Amino acid sequence: MHFTVEAQKIVADHLLPGNIAIDATAGNGHDTVFLANTVGPHGKVHAIDIQGQAIERLQQTLSQLDLLERVEVYAADHALIEQVVAPKLSSFVDCAMFNLGYLPHSDKSITTHRASTLRAVEGAYRLLKPGGMMTVLAYVGHPGGRDEAEGVSAWLESHADDLRVDRIQDESNPQSPILWVINKNP
């Protein structure tokens, strides 16, 4: 199973043209482009990444695909999601996507971490409208990845009364990524 594709399929069933979405870990921009195409010309995507290299690639890709007008790009730590994105919002967010870990084909020592990810997930949750969806894809096979995933799992458990959570993982593979599909109660 390709977990990124699975996350996008699930989000595609929820997100509508004209909606507002967040790509909290923009990276190479695959989720950002998917979200921008899904929300259409009347929607908006807010894409965040801490790495300048990722931001440059993302802006080039968005320009080539004529999607720049649909996307606000922020060079910032995803832990600051609420402070960075909230001032630009006219309403709550319909969907947020997280693809944790490191930027493919780059410095693998630069990764998301438990503390910043938990701040980011909490911030995105507060920006999410009732009935909104969030996906979090965690990779446990890199240093710090399992700790980060355990932190996300604990955060979800602590908010169990406010959320409906589906967990997707290849249980036969202990190194399998974990995809959480989170729906905020209406």
Regions found by a protein language model. Name each.
Residues 25, 120, 127-138:
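Conserved beta-strand signature within the Rossmann-like core of class I S-adenosyl-L-methionine
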Residues 98-120:
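Mobile active-site "lid"/loop adjacent to the S-adenosyl-L-methionine
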Residues 142-186:
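Class I S-adenosyl-L-methionine
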Residues 27, 102-103, 139-143:
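Short "lid" loop at the C-terminus of a central beta-strand within the Rossmann-like core
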Residues 17-18, 40-43, 128-134:
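Short glycine-dipeptide loop
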Residues 44-49:
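Conserved SAM-binding motif I beta-strand of class I
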Residues 1-24, 30-33, 37-38, 55-91:
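S-adenosyl-L-methionine
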